[in-house]
C-alpha cells in the first residue's frame, strides 16, 4: 500500500484513460483507508476543478460524500472561486 503522500500525488496527476475512472476510485478508497483524508482535500477539489462538467462516471459522487465528512467549507469556497464546477455547485446547494 502506498503512503498518503504518494496517494495524494497520484490523485493530483490523475487523468482517465479512455474514459476509465476506476483508478481514481481506488485512490480515493486508499486515501480514506489511511485515516487522514483531510490532508488531500485540495487535490480532491482539484479533480472537480480539472473536470468541471463531469461526474467521473459516478466516482465524483464518492469524492463528494467523502469530503462532506470533513471540514470542507473553506476549501469549497476557494474551489468555486478558482474554477466553478458541477460537483462544487452541488456541494454548495447541499450545505
Where are these regions (language model features)?
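Amphipathic alpha-helical scaffolding segments comprising HEAT/armadillo-like alpha-solenoid repeats
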Residues: 1-11, 36-48, 71-81
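Long, low-complexity, highly charged intrinsically disordered regions
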Residues: 1-27
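Structural detector for internal amphipathic alpha-helices that build alpha-solenoid repeat scaffolds
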Residues: 22-35, 58-69, 88-95
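Short hydrophobic interaction/assembly module
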Residues: 43-73
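Alpha-helical interaction scaffolds
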Residues: 75-95
